[in-house]
Each structure stands twice: as structure tokens, then as C-alpha cells.
Amino acid sequence: MYNIPDNVKGAVEFDPWLKPFADVLSERRYLADKWLYDITHATPDGSYQSLSKFARDSYKSYGLHANPETKEITYKEWAPNAERAFLVGDFNNWDTTSHELKNKDEFGNFTITLHPLPNGDFAIPHDSKIKVMFILPDGSKIFRLPAWITRATQPSKETSKQFGPAYEGRFWNPENPYKFVHPRPKFSESVDSLRIYEAHVGISSPEPKITTYKEFTEKVLPRIKYLGYDAIQLMAIMEHAYYASFGYQVTNFFAASSRFGTPEELKELIDTAHSMGILVLLDVVHSHASKNVEDGLNMFDGSDHQYFHSISSGRGEHPLWDSRLFNYGKFEVQRFLLANLAFYVDVYQFDGFRFDGVTSMLYVHHGVGAGGSFSGDYNEYLSRDRSFVDHEALAYLMLANDLVHEMLPNLAVTVAEDVSGYPTLCLPRSIGGTGFDYRLAMALPDMWIKLIKEKKDDEWEMGSIVYTLTNRRYGEKVVAYCESHDQALVGDKTLAFWLMDAAMYTDMTVLKEPSIVIDRGIALHKMIRLITHSLGGEAYLNFEGNEFGHPEWLDFPNVNNGDSYKYARRQFNLADDPLLRYQNLNEFDRSMQLCEKRHKWLNTKQAYVSLKHEGDKMIVFERNNLLFIFNFHPTNSYSDYRVGVEKAGTYHIVLNSDRAEFGGHNRINESSEFFTTDLEWNNRKNFLQVYIPSRVALVLALKE
């Protein structure tokens, strides 16, 4: 008999395999709950404050803030290793003595208030350059961008030649800040489907250039709405000095990337998305930070252990990413990161977050090397001796979920990028879980690419495909996808490219009959996406361009490609060209999203799979009263194919991958009705018979 602590009883009831590890789970929850208590009582008199108040008060007090009524500017910075601090910039001609931050408190916080100029203007002009200078214990001086800076820009070529390429901090205080006019879309995480369009603003144009927030708003948002997605996951928003890092080497956590435009233009983008009923999620990077010193957090106050684990501890640097690792056990680090989330929810109206690098956070080995080979043995996650879990990082993730769900009750979406399969990651905090709403189903793209690369079509194992698509923890929702930005990067190929390769350059025209390669590629591209969408999870994600089979890979400008933008773009023009077959894939993707929107299968109970036939290469399943039929056989078509179904009645076709407009062959009569026979078949109470051609998928629904 196991004694199950009260604070994890709910989680153990969900997953009985947790029983032997209940004490460890309980300790992990206790640490987060203790931190939560400490934070919510970190007031002058020890009275209670909510977690969201703590986070909001933090981003409103730290950094630079302009008071429109008094015209005063306040600046607060935490730099415990510094002896003195001075604010310098264009506003005081970079005078290193005139504006000293006073009142260094016991925690290492410096503050200054700048009174308005005699003419009543703010002492620091809008968008002017600014830095903080610290004097260290040894008397040396260092210049940094304020840690909470809300705008940082690339220096001009002249400045770069003279002072180096470090980003420049700017005081952002526009006279007419953008005012949101549209409410957040109505979304209930418990019942509504999440169809996510993963996008990177900078590459969102067919032209070899950096796309702007404004262009994305005008040209890409209508495209996403047309396709039927109800959420956008925006990458590379947090400021990063190195464009080719894809946004994952963050330098300035509170600054929206200036490459794409201004903070106000990003607000307009999000507000416009909301007007279209589209949620906007931020791809948030709290797993590590750029090593940049002059324009980043590294060595910010002259020490290597202010925000991060010290280098000497062996925990301060990521072994593969060449980046710094946060010390989540520090109160001020918790403040900084939690305030960062609150800032994006409030100031930019983001509706949730996809947390990057969760596996790296969860384990002290960061999922690298031997420790990163997870077999699914619960000891790897929960054993005292063998799990190598970073309890402090896990506790931080629990607090992050507490905060986001407190700020956006019944609306917030949090997604974990975890490849390890950590149990309880997506169970509610209240029962002992980590609190995420979804985890990414990271095994799915690997499966599809491995199949296409290594197996002939007639060697595909239906049972193996179904197992991988349905292999998820009970009660923990996943975001299914067959490819994301990871698969599009240089060195890998998109699904379409694996399927059709060089033929995409010559044979995608509608002016001639499709080649065998193109015909197969288009058919399988549709089937793979539909079966992943309908069987693989409780939400779905697509990386921009892949919906229409974008050819080629992604490669950001860097020294190895001569700083070329040729592959750092999305060729939407291909999908808009009526003479190319990309439009067929685009239209199928739209119909698939709209079919899900109408009939809802994602955020429902897992499917019942009634058939996995290896010889016929058939997969049949039901989900939310819909009947899904897939024929993966490369050559065989079947007439009067018997299919089991639980509910009796008359069925009709609601989605058919063989339509000509989807690049199919129009072999299906969509006006057909299918009547059930009251005889058991494949463990279902009834059966019906269908014509199902080779490499075709059908979705049937009961006629109302």
C-alpha cells in the first residue's frame, strides 16, 4: 500500500503508475507552492497579494516608465554586484555623471526619478538612445542596455563600424500609443478546438527580405483567416540580436523585435487578429538566454551569476546551444520571468504561450547525451536517484502556468515543447500537475519522415502509424503536427519535399498530367495531414507555408550563405497561382480546417480505431461521431468495402481528399448516402460499405 499525499491525490487517480512516486511528486509540488506563498506574501507588511499583482507591479516598476500626468520618468534596475549606477543617453549627451541612480537597497535595486524639463516635456525624448552605466567594486565601468528595456534596435552601419554591432536601447514613449479596440476572441480551453498557424513575421513574404508587422497584418492575417485557423503562434518576437537564431537566442526579454517594426505595429497585428476571431500565442523563450554581454543579460552587473547559474557551478551554460541558463531558484529571476509573461499578456494582449525548450529546463542534463534517451520508464522522470529533474525549473513552470491562467481564466493557452514525455506536465496544478494545457506531440513528425525516407509505400505498417498517433498520456492534451519550423530548417526537408523532391520544380504545373511522383506526393501529403489532424491529438499545428507543400528549406542570412535572404521567405505566390498544384494542397488544408471547425473532432475524446489492416493498408476510426476512412494502399482501390461503425443511421461525406480541386481524381460520388446494416463488424454494432480508392481519405458524418 502506498500513502498518497493529499496534494497529488488527483494526479495519482488520473495515472495509477504514479503511485510509487507520489512522495517525489508531492515534494515537487510543495516547492512550487512554497514559492507561491513567498511571492504572494512578499509585501511590506507580509499581507497577501495575488500572483498576477506581483507580476504586474514588477513590470510596472522595474525598467523605464513615463508618467503622462506628471511627465516624470522613473527607472529601476536590479544590479546587486554594482557599486553605483548612472543613466546615460542622447538626452544628457552621454554624460556619465549627471544622472546617478540612488538608493541602492538591501536587495541591490537602484532607482532614479527624472523630472520634466522646464518646458514641460519629458526629460528623455521618445525613441532616443539610452544605456545604464555601472561602476563595479574594482572601479571599472561597464555599459549595458537596461534589463527591462522595451525597445532595442540594430545600429546603423556607421555606428556599427565605430562601436560594434551591439543593439541600441531606446526609450519607447510614443505620444499616441496604440489603443486596442477589439476584445480577445471567446475561447474555452475545455471545449473549443485549437488549430494553430505557426508563423515567423520576418519570413512571411515571397520576397527575399525581412517582412514587417504591418505587411503581416495586411497580407498574412487574411490568409490565415481564409484557411480556417483560429490561433497564431508567433515566433521570434522577443528581441534577438542574431536573426539566424530564429528568435531562440533572446537578448532583450521585454522588447519586441524591432526588425519587423515598432511595438505599436505589433499591437495592431494582434488586435487585428483578435478582430478575426484568432488567438495569438507567443513562442516564449525562458529556457535560456543569449550570451551577448553589451546588449543582453549576460554579465549584466559584472557578475556571471546574477540571472544565471554561475559558470563555475557547471550549470550556467547550455552544452549545445552556447547560451546562458537561468537560476530559477532566485527570487529576482522568478520576478523577471513572471513579469515578462504578465507584460506580454497585458501590454501586447497575447492570449497564451508556447514555452520553448521545456525538456532542457526540466532536466539538469537538458535532454542532451545519454540522459536525453527517454524510454518511458517512470524512474527517468520521478525516481529520486535516476530522474535528474531540475526541481527549481519545474517549480518555475508551475508558477508560470499559475500566473497565465490567473490572468486569463478559462481563456489562456499554454503549450509545452517537451520531447521527454514527462508525466503530469499537462495535468492541472490543483491536482498535482505542472499546469500546461497542451504538450507538443514531437514524435509524430519524426515518424512520418522516417516512414517516407526508409520504407516503401507497401511496407508502411498501419498498426505502427496508429500506435504512434495515439500514444499519449491519458488526460494530457497534445498538439498534433506532422511538421513544424524544425523540419523546415536547412539540413532537413519539409514533408512535401521528402515526398516529391526535385519534381516540385518541374512537375507542379496543371498544364500537364501529374507525374507519378507528384500524384503520389499530393495524395500522401493530404492523407498524412488529415490522419495527424484527426487521430494525433487534441489540437493541431501547421508551420506557415507547409499547408500548401512549400518547397525548399529555411535558411536565415548568415556568413555561410553570403547573408542571403533567398531561403528566408515563404513563397505564398505558389499557392496563389492557378496554374500550379500548390493551390490544390492549400484548398484541401482549408477544407480540413473548416470541416473540423464545423464538426469538431480535435478537443474531444480519443478516437476508437476499429481497423488497422496491414494487407489492405486500411485505417478506420471514429471520433466525435465522425467516421474516418483511410486507404494507404499504393495501388488497390476497394468497392463495397465493409467498415464498422457504432451509431446506426444514414451517413454522408463531409470531406473527400480525392476531389479534383484538391489535386485528386474525382472518383467519389459525394452525393452518395451510406446506410448502416445492423450487424456487428470490427467490434462495432453496425457496418456500412464504401468505395474507397487508392490513397484516398474520407470523412463521413451522420445525416441530421
Swiss-Prot record:
Active site: 356, 417
Residues annotated to bind (1,4-alpha-D-glucosyl)n: 94, 131
Record site feature (Transition state stabilizer), residues: 486
Keyword terms, alphabetized: Cytoplasm, Glycogen biosynthesis, Glycosyltransferase, Phosphoprotein, Transferase
Protein's GO biological process: glycogen biosynthetic process
Location(s) in or outside the cell: Cytoplasm
Known catalytic reactions: Transfers a segment of a (1->4)-alpha-D-glucan chain to a primary hydroxy group in a similar glucan chain
Major subcellular location class: cytoplasm
EC numbers, comma separated: 2.4.1.18
Pathway(s) the chain acts in: Glycan biosynthesis; glycogen biosynthesis
Single GO term (MF): hydrolase activity, hydrolyzing O-glycosyl compounds
Record keyword Flavoprotein present: no
UniProt enzyme class: transferase
Function noted in UniProt: Glycogen-branching enzyme participates in the glycogen biosynthetic process along with glycogenin and glycogen synthase. Generates alpha-1,6-glucosidic branches from alpha-1,4-linked glucose chains, to increase solubility of the glycogen polymer.
Other known facts: Present with 1230 molecules/cell in log phase SD medium.
Family: Belongs to the glycosyl hydrolase 13 family. GlgB subfamily.
Name of the protein this chain belongs to: 1,4-alpha-glucan-branching enzyme
Source organism of the structure: Saccharomyces cerevisiae (strain ATCC 204508 / S288c)
